[in-house]
Amino acid sequence: MAWTTHKFRKNIMDSETGVIRKKWNGRIKVALVYPSTYHIGMSNLGFQAVYELINTFENVVCERSFLPENGGSDAADRITTIESGSSISSFDLIAFSVSYENDYPNLLTILEKAKLPLGSKDRGIPHPLVIAGGVAFFLNPEPLASFIDCFLIGEAEAILPRFFDAVSHDLLSQDRISCLKTLAREVPGVYVPSLYRTEYNSDGTLNAFEPIADVPHKIERLYVKDLSFTPTCSSIVTPNTIFDNTFLMEVSRGCPHGCRFCAAGFVYRPPRFRPFSILKECMEQGTSKTDKIGLVGAAVSDLPDLNKICGWEFEKDARISFSSLRADALTSELLSILKKSKTKTATIAPDAGSDRMRNVINKGISETDILDAAEKIVAAGIPNLKLYFMVGLPTETLDDVEAIVTLCKKIKHRFLKSSRAKKRMGEITVSLNSFVPKPFTPFQWVQMDDVRLLKSKIKKVKNGLKRVANVRVHADIPKWAYIHALLSRGDRKAGQILSLVNTNQGNWPRTFKSSPVNPDFYVYRERSLDELLPWDFIDHGIRKSFLKSEYKKAIQGKTSPPCVVESCNICGVCTE
């Protein structure tokens, strides 16, 4: 069914509970765009939270838009909003909410389908102002620097009120450069790429990154210091998402454990937890819409009131779910509540097969923790187990890859032993992903494994487990991990590759063959610890010396303790 049909929009809106309907009436009109399909975008709690937040501003109306269901491949596709069916090109602002780097090409597709010039320098009055935010840009916005007018670097609750206080019809009617200069000067966290100059060394590395106007030299990431007053939960519940009529609520932000591969554990510092009082308000709102509640956070297991929350949900006959739980935090109370919630699958993330590799990544759990967790899960009556692993981690050997197979077999043995007592054998699903180095982590300097090597490692795990009954292996596709790495650590020159792949209608092999920019430079090259990195202009409060220290400890196989926010100033975020 074509994206533009009235029937499609009507079916979508009829299935939604909680949609916001707001009259335009001279308000600033914002098209909030998720650069993937409705099904994916509406599964993203951050996108929903931004939609609700923008609509709380009296002078603003916000409507949602997405990539067409066919990926924009139909020449007749138009990019319109769900609420009114209006073209996004008729709005005052187009705001992209982006969580995943591999969605960058979709962003260009959407601009093109909206009949807007792709380059920021080619847009002006009467074109909409094109802005972008989301965790992908906390890390590194540079590959999209040529296409976006301004980026909002920070958490939505901290930056959006200031941004929309500054935005007015008068400001938007000014010439584009004047408008952008005003925003960059008046709103902390606003990054306007056109107001900064880059200079490169002969070897392609970055030599200089400097402002060319009276704007900040560094862009400070804004964040909410106390989550006690800012609930984040689903504004709309619909069956047309990955989570199917589930009310999502964020219970925490950031993570204290400091896994060295995990960007969320660093750019969302300090770790913060919401109190039971505000979460109870969210749960009351959620249970009025559905009986399925999903807890969202990088450190759900560390939430002080987790048992209390789960107990409250159970009293309301709600079913509760988690993204994943730490193997060393599975209490009998928690497992009992999960069973009562009719949870069929529990998820834990060993991430690596050997204790040596888990020390390298600072995972903080042992093989004993993992095996005990598997046994507890089955004993609690939860029949299925999902395990997350990575291949291609720094210092990894083939012995470490083989250790994934060995550990899975040990887990299966424990699983089988406990399942026999229950007279029921469930399934173990192994999810295998290629490691991608990310900015603002201790591994931001390392090279990524060659795609062919990653394929061979994945094959080794699959072959090692293919004859093990009730164990299934799902692996990512390394070529997409390669593109992920390119877009994660690219500089402005990587934007040329994005422009070319858009011209080639998503054909990456043809793009790489004809690109004047070598993508291997961003993917397979190990960086010097002293190199000026494309994302160094963003200030997360994390000392670069801390990341270097963590990288060196990783290579030595040494671990670091978790964050103790009240008394720690090691990384630099909590020095105030």
Which sequence ranges carry the predicted segments?
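Canonical Radical SAM [4Fe-4S] cluster-binding loop centered on the CxxxCxxC motif
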Residues: N44, T241-F276, S567-E576
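Short secondary-structure boundary/capping segments
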Residues: F47, L111, S146-I148, V167-S168, ...
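Low-complexity, highly charged intrinsically disordered N-terminal segments
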Residues: V30-P35, G41-E52, V60-E63, P68, ...
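Glycine-rich beta-alpha loop elements in corrinoid/cobalamin-binding modules
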Residues: L67-I212, P439-D491, L498-P509
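Conserved SAM/AdoMet-binding glycine-rich loop
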Residues: V33, T37, E281-K386, M390-T429
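Flexible glycine/acidic-rich beta-alpha junction loops that bind and position SAM and/or redox cofactors
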Residues: G71, R197-N201, P304, E333-L334, ...
